[in-house]
Amino acid sequence: MAPKKPEPKKDDAKAAPKAAPAPAPPPEPERPKEVEFDASKIKIEFTPEQIEEFKEAFMLFDRTPKCEMKITYGQCGDVLRALGQNPTQAEVLRVLGKPRQEELNTKMMDFETFLPMLQHISKNKDTGTYEDFVEGLRVFDKEGNGTVMGAELRHVLATLGERLTEDEVEKLMAGQEDSNGCINYEAFVKHIMSS
């Protein structure tokens, strides 16, 4: 005679199998840390000749009635760019202490306040190379023939990242499209980087 199988308990039959606990969501990737700007900790490493040159450029932007050697917060990015830097608007706002929109045209700064900002921006450049820009545009090259659609590039420039105005996009793209509305992106990047 075969051994008797134990009969299952009635409670066990009614118990539903326990669901496994939901897996924990994957941890979010750590955001890159912003380089904090503290003007008091910035060591000025420019030569006296460079500082004099920067001062002359700074004075060109001074719109005060008595030439007080001051610019508005809103002009800071323009002066930085005139001095060969290429900060994003977000970087400019960060070194300015993230002022409110209305403060950009009313708050003023003198050259001594500006100089540490220039030093910080020039040391923390994250300038893309020609290859970086070409690689970024290659994503939009659907045919693999070295071109992107002009309309698509216009859309990207106006809606992604540091957005450009319609006028800025038109100036940038003037004379770049071929008869099919395509743009050779390698030539486009060369054009932009030489401007």
UniProtKB/Swiss-Prot annotation:
Q: Where is this region: Disordered?
A: 1-37
What's a GO biological-process term for it? regulation of the force of heart contraction
- As stated in the Swiss-Prot or TrEMBL entry, residues carrying the post-translational modification Phosphothreonine are T88, T127, T129
**Residue numbers carrying Phosphotyrosine:** Y130
Alphabetized UniProt keyword annotations: Cardiomyopathy, Disease variant, Methylation, Motor protein, Muscle protein, Myosin, Phosphoprotein, Repeat
Q: Name the domain of life this protein comes from.
A: Eukaryota
Q: Which residues carry this modification: N,N,N-trimethylalanine?
A: A2
Spell out the InterPro entries in the cross-references: CALM/Myosin/TropC-like, EF-hand-dom_pair, EF_hand_dom
GO cellular component annotations of the record: A band; cytosol; I band; muscle myosin complex; myosin II complex; sarcomere
Annotated consequence of substituting M149V: In CMH8; with mid-left ventricular chamber thickening
Locate the Phosphoserine modifications and list their residues: S179
Which residues fall in a compositionally biased region of kind Basic and acidic residues?
1-15, 28-37
User: Which residue ranges traverse the bilayer?
Assistant: none
Post-translational modification note = The N-terminus is blocked.
Q: Which GO terms describe its molecular function?
A: actin monomer binding; calcium ion binding; cytoskeletal motor activity; myosin II heavy chain binding; structural constituent of muscle
Q: Give the disease association.
A: Cardiomyopathy, familial hypertrophic, 8: A hereditary heart disorder characterized by ventricular hypertrophy, which is usually asymmetric and often involves the interventricular septum. The symptoms include dyspnea, syncope, collapse, palpitations, and chest pain. They can be readily provoked by exercise. The disorder has inter- and intrafamilial variability ranging from benign to malignant forms with high risk of cardiac failure and sudden cardiac death. Rarely, patients present a variant of familial hypertrophic cardiomyopathy, characterized by mid-left ventricular chamber thickening.
What's the subunit arrangement here? Myosin is a hexamer of 2 heavy chains and 4 light chains.
What is the designated name of this protein? Myosin light chain 3
- Organism of origin is Homo sapiens (Human)
Q: Which gene encodes it?
A: MYL3
